[in-house]
């Protein structure tokens, strides 16, 4: 992330995705949520995400953060309830509908799997 305080421009790279479902394949989702909170602390005129459109609207950051938070917390609850990955995928359709204008629907399916696998207890043999 690069922040230009004089110009109030924030180059976020893959930390922000506007108009796309975030690709969290290699991300630490709780950390990504914390980073979004940190980004919101900066006075920013323009956000330049790694994917999507340039924006001056901080609500874009909030929307992405809230999406990741909802996804992460929902999957965590389902893992604690002992749900399978297939049962956990039930959350995808409502989230896709809520963010109907976003592209990259395949990233939502991938995110569900990545987060689910990261929360499952490790079994030692």
Task: Kindly give the residue locations of the regions a language model identified.
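Accessory terminal helices/loops
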Residues: 41-42, 55-125
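Metallo-beta-lactamase
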Residues: 1-77
């Amino acid at each position: 992330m690069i922040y230009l305080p004089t110009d109030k421009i924030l180059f976020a790279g893959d930390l922000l995705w506007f108009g796309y479902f975030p690709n969290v394949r290699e991300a630490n989702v709780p950390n990504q949520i914390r980073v979004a909170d940190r980004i919101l602390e900066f006075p920013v005129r323009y956000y330049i995400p790694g994917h999507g459109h340039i924006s001056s609207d901080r609500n874009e950051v909030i929307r992405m953060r809230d999406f990741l938070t909802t996804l992460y917390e929902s999957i965590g609850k389902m893992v604690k309830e002992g749900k399978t990955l297939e049962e956990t995928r039930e959350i995808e359709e409502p989230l896709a509908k809520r963010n109907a204008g976003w592209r990259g629907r395949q990233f939502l399916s991938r995110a569900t799997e990545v987060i689910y696998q990261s929360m499952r207890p490790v079994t030692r043999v």
